[in-house]
Amino acid sequence: MRIATAVYLYSLYPDESKKGANSRQIFRALGDESLDPSTIDAYLERLYDEIATHIFRAEGTDRYYFKTEENPRALVRYAAKDVKDEEVKLHLQKQLVGKIIPSTDVVAVNIFEKEIKRDNTDPGKLNLFVIDYEEVFRIYAHLKRSKEYESEAEDVVAREAFSRIFSQMLSITAPNRNSVVLLFPVAGGIPSFMSDVKELIACEKLKKERSKDKEFLKELKAIQERIYAKTAQKLINLYSYAGFFRKNDQVIGQLSPLTYDEKAKYTERIFEELERKWGKVLSSASEDYIYGVMGKEKDYIKLSELINTIANSTGYPFVPAKYLKGSIKELVKAGEIAVYRGEICDPEEVDLRKSEEIVKSLKLGIELGEIRDSDYVVKKEFAEELLGAAKRKRADEAANRILEVLGDRNYAEISSIESELPDLSRKDIVDAVKRSQRLELYGGDISLIRKVEEGAELSESEKEEILSGFNAEHGEFIFKKEYAEGIKNKIRTVEWEPPEISEDEERKGEEIKVSDLIERFEDFEGRRVKRIKVKGSGSNSLKEDALNLGGAVPFLNLKGKIAVDLKGRVFFKCSSELEKAGIIEEILRKIAELDSNPEYSVELEIDAEVNDDFRIFAEQLTSTKSEKTLVVE
């Protein structure tokens, strides 16, 4: 009362510019050292906001003074008493809640919905359901009146109310259940919050009623801004409990206290809290996460199905579609996962038409632009297998076309083939030759081939040059395989008796499966393969393995070794004394001609760099069921 009296006395000052008093003047006027100036400030604010009807605040100053007319703040309080509860709910539903907790591109906000349905949830977004405060207050009040809960603490009663609403709204069979989070209000804060909302509505009504009174509207605007900031903070404080499923269990937890900031989106802060505190949501998805959702049995999944699975599988944190797509793009770029646009098939179903589509549509290790819900997300291993099948099919077709172009010719320059097959690049042609069992690359002197054809005598060095030319990784000529073999047979003059390979020879390096090298190519790229081992049974498999291993000849060092063991049939061993790769190739050819059904093991000592050419050869080896391993240094 003394403070109000002091303000009144200062209001009697005749000079309008000096009317009224601030907290410092009142402190001096009262002369009471027990008073704190900050206490006087708080009381003046309360006097203006909640008690006095004729006190005003001088514009642009901190002075308060009395006038004969009622102040705008008092008029707001009066008008608020006439605002109905239904108006409050409508205002919250249509304006305030959506402004403080807005929907975003990763969060869909549902305000006061009574049930969770497919048509009010988005599987690609976190679906935030702001629970009706009236329903919470009704259940809370009912529980407090019951004998079971009348003596329980407020927090216990509130959690029981939340649990009952949770069970009513969100069952384990609800659509998109993993994407749903319920926001519960604290029952004890509802009455005070509603009073503030009524004052906000009253401000809007007074604006319309006094639309021509500029001075009044100016002060009313400042009043409304203060009420809005206070109400927004109360809304944040009110809706401070979240409910969601983790696996099949209901989880209800309290959010950390947050301060209202008109520039910050409370929705984003809720998302951050759910991720940081409970791991309910994730802002990115790893390869392991995506593979886990897909399951071991699936090699690929349509993106729309992946999104729906995440939205409905409570065993995983929820990842919004926007963040999921961003993560997939990064994983594709890193070569960890693939994306396919079109209708996908299994490798054994790949035909020529499909192979063209696969090479064009399968994205792995590149930067993606747009990613669509209709695209397939493909596990890396399957993608490489599918791409390998497509490349083999394309290579087979290219090889057929090369043979057609060769016609009656036994060989031709690559440049000549290129000119007759303009739709194939040089790389396409070379890859086709390397993959084909009917063609061979030659990188030696073509004049030496002509000498053989003419029956001329060749020196040992010239013979070596021809054999090395056929074993080269690069070349300028393409030969029909059968004709190339005939040339080699004409110049092979070395008789061989296979010496023993020491059983105690030191084995160095890491032994891996051929399939592991293909799947983890980037891990082994640049390392050197020192040995190939093949074990199997059956004559057909033996012949195919022997022919496939012929592709290893270009990778043999000059002192290559071969050991071939056919149980009960024949045993070959060649060691470093045999410095002609042609001898080793001849052994493999003879093995392929054997007519038996043996168990067999073949071991080649080589010296090859793991590169794209070696990967092509390794893929050829996988065409049979025999066990194949490599020793890699």
From Swiss-Prot:
Q: What is this protein called?
A: Uncharacterized protein AF_2340
